A protein has these predicted regions:
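Membrane-proximal helix-turn-helix segments that form the acceptor-binding/catalytic region
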Residues: 26, 75, 99, 103-111, ...
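Nucleotide-sugar donor-binding and catalytic loop/hinge architecture
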Residues: 1, 178-194, 218-223
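Donor nucleotide-sugar binding/catalytic pocket of nucleotide-sugar-dependent glycosyltransferases
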Residues: 141-183
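N-terminal subdomain of nucleotide-sugar transferases
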Residues: 1-44, 53, 84, 149, ...
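Conserved donor-binding/catalytic core segment of Leloir-type glycosyltransferases
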Residues: 4, 186-205, 211-214, 229
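Nucleotide-activated donor-binding/catalytic signature segment of Leloir-type glycosyltransferases, i.e.
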Residues: 232, 240-255
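Short N-terminal targeting/anchoring amphipathic segment
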Residues: 78-99, 113-116
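Acceptor-binding helix/loop patch of EC 2.4 sugar-transfer enzymes
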Residues: 8, 12, 115-144, 176-178, ...
Length: 255
C-alpha cells in the first residue's frame, strides 16, 4: 500500500523531533507500507518548496509571498496524493487547522484515501502562554473540530479516547533501537548519580521541573550527590527564565 507521511516543516539533523519522524517512517516501511515523506524545505538559495522524499512537488518561490503560499497552497499535496494513487496519509499535526488543511483532507478522502492525524502533545493549548502565541493559535481553535470530523482517526500518545469529538488511536511513544542502542556499561552510582539531558532544550522537556526538584533535594544537605548535565542550547527566552534563575537562586551551579 502506498502511504504519505506529511509534516508541515523541515528537518534539522540535531533535532529530536526530526529524528523521531524518520524513526516513524522507518517503522511504517518495516510494516510493509510504501512510504513517501512529504515535508517543507528551504533550499540553500532561499527557494521554498514542498518535497516528497527527494522530489520537488511544488516550487513556492522566495520571500513573504512564498511563506503565504506555503500556508495556503496545499492543493499541491492533495494533487500528489491523487496522482500517485496513495491510499493512506499520516499527518503530523502542526496545530494548523484552517480551511486550507480541511480542503486538502477532503480532497484526499474523496478519492478514497484513509487519513489520520497524529497530535504529539494533547492537550496543547496550555503550551501557548503569551498573547501573541495565543493569537496565532486562534484559527486552529476555530477549525480543529471541523478538520477532525473528516479524519479516519487521531493518533495520540495520551490516554484520551476522544479528541475534538473524534475517536483516537492510542499508541506509545518510542525510539529506534537500531539507531540508539541500549547502553551496556554499568556505572558505579554508590556515592553519586550523574543525570544527563541532551537536547535543544524546550519547555516541554521538563528540565525546569527536574532542576526545581534538585533545589528541594539539596535543601536537606544530603550526603549523596546528584548531578544534572545539560548538553545543548536553551532554545528560547521562556526556557532561560524557567531554568537559569532557579540554578542561580539555589546555588546549583556545581550540580
Amino acid at each position: 500500500m502506498k502511504a504519505l507521511f506529511l509534516i508541515f516543516h523541515g528537518f534539522d539533523k540535531a533535532n529530536g523531533i526530526s529524528k523521531k519522524i524518520h524513526y516513524q517512517v522507518k517503522a511504517l516501511k518495516e510494516c510493509g507500507l510504501d512510504v513517501r515523506l512529504c515535508y517543507y524545505d528551504i533550499s540553500p538559495s532561499g527557494e521554498r518548496r514542498w518535497m516528497a522524499d527527494n522530489a520537488v512537488i511544488a516550487e513556492l518561490g522566495q520571500g513573504v509571498f512564498a511563506k503565504i503560499r506555503k500556508r495556503l497552497g496545499l492543493n499541491c499535496i492533495a494533487n500528489y496524493v491523487l496522482r500517485e494513487n496513495i491510499h493512506f496519509v499520516y499527518i503530523r499535526s502542526y496545530h494548523n487547522a484552517n480551511p486550507f488543511t480541511i480542503n486538502m483532507v477532503k480532497r484526499m478522502k474523496k478519492k478514497g484515501a484513509k487519513v489520520v492525524m497524529e497530535i504529539p502533545t494533547f492537550p496543547y493549548d496550555q503550551e501557548y502562554i503569551t498573547w501573541p502565541m495565543k493569537f496565532k493559535r486562534l484559527t486552529d481553535r476555530c477549525f480543529r473540530h471541523r478538520l477532525a470530523s473528516f479524519l479516519n482517526g487521531i493518533v495520540t500518545f495520551s490516554n484520551a479516547k476522544n479528541i475534538f469529538g473524534e475517536r483516537t488511536i492510542r499508541i506509545s511513544n518510542g525510539i529506534d533501537f537500531d539507531a540508539i542502542p541500549m547502553k551496556k556499561q554499568m556505572n558505579d552510582t554508590t556515592h553519586e548519580l550523574h543525570l544527563i539531558g541532551v537536547a535543544e532544550v524546550h519547555y516541554w522537556h521538563g528540565f525546569d521541573r527536574l532542576i526545581r526538584g534538585l533545589a528541594e533535594y539539596y535543601c536537606t544537605n544530603p550526603d549523596y550527590k546528584v548531578y544534572f548535565h545539560i548538553v545543548g542550547p536553551l532554545s528560547g527566552e521562556r526556557e532561560k527564565q524557567e531554568i537559569l534563575p532557579v540554578i542561580r537562586d539555589n546555588k546549583l551551579e556545581s550540580y
